[in-house]
Amino acid sequence: MNIQIHRGQNQIGGNIIEISTETTKIVLDVGLELDDDKNQELPDIDGLFDFAGYDAVFISHYHGDHLGLAYYVHKDIPIFIGEDSYKIISASDNYKNIETFKPKGFLNHKKSITVGDITVTPYLCDHSAFDSYMLLCEADGEKVLYTGDFRSNGRKPYNWLLKELPKNIDALLCEGTTLSREGYVSQTESELEQEAVELFKTNTGPVFVLQSSMNIDRIVTMYRAAKRTSRIFLEELYMAEITSAIGGSIPNPYFSDVYTFITNPKRYETLSQYDHKVGKDFISKSHFVMCVRNSMLSYLKSLSEKMSFKNGLLVYSFWSGYKENDEMKEFLNECENLGLKIVTLHTSGHADETAIKELIGTVKPKKLIPIHTENAERFKELVPDVVVEIEDCN
């Protein structure tokens, strides 16, 4: 079994990994590069975009740096992805009037899929993207495990995953996003929730949370904090469409204490399907936590004319690097001008050093290939007894 990393070893994001035998070729993830513009050219990989030269594509999760090029994969190449992942990306695309790619099938925990002479087994893992998977590839008597993106600090028990994973594998392709941050230790979502509770109690005014509408764990965290401080939870229509697509125990518009609102009147027809739909009059008289996006500045200004933002709070719950974005800077500055106190509450969607070492110690690879990292050399220090393969392949 051969491994070729077309992209993603000495950088964060943009993963495209080829696994092949003499008769079968598959790809694990087809990601956009994080630092490129939206008009980036397709990678020059024969048979992936121009014709059907591969037997399948497997997508670990729905973040753009792992899935973004799936829309351009040749239509005759089957794509596999988690079912809830697909529901989320479909809801997002539908809201934006984008046509979603059609998968051949769905990934499920420990349900193997055989393509040619390669068998792929997904393992459900925790990440800031809901329904993420590690992928075990087996062929020619060898086992290769691709971690995708993972963490130990979410709401899924990490020990459960470690018990489920295969042992004594031939090669581990392991992400190391956080290895550039020396001494970094991930805060848990539960710890984040408790911090949010204290903030929501201390700041008696309205609370706005700036976070990704696709970060389901963070939605759960903020919903639980709202519930514990007797605040209603407000989801703008885009988030509501995503959470309702998953349903179940995820806070969604069908919960009695979750309310949905719109910032664009043209969206009212879509909003009307939900029972708990509200407007500014209701919101202005309520004690709430509202999830917002940085495109909602004019809406917040309009809302501030109907209610006081005194003792109000804006919780910034993204990676800190996004604060350098011009649009984000403007949004945060204007929120301060509206009288909101800005507080950062965020934790990484990626494993810290301790979690990475635990994983490596559990699966016991013969060799380790770093991916999704800007500090691949750190793996040699973390696990000196494991062969670490680093190639300049970008």
Question: Locations of the language-model features?
Answer:
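Hard-cation-handling environments
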Residues: V185-N311, I371
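Generic beta-strand/beta-sheet core signal
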Residues: D29, G82, T147, E175, ...
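C-terminal regulatory/interaction regions
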Residues: Q11, R228, P265-N394
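Short connector loops at secondary-structure junctions
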Residues: G31, T177-E182, Y238-S249, H346-A355
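His/Asp/Glu-rich metal-coordinating catalytic cores
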Residues: M1-F58, G64-D217, T221-R224, R228, ...
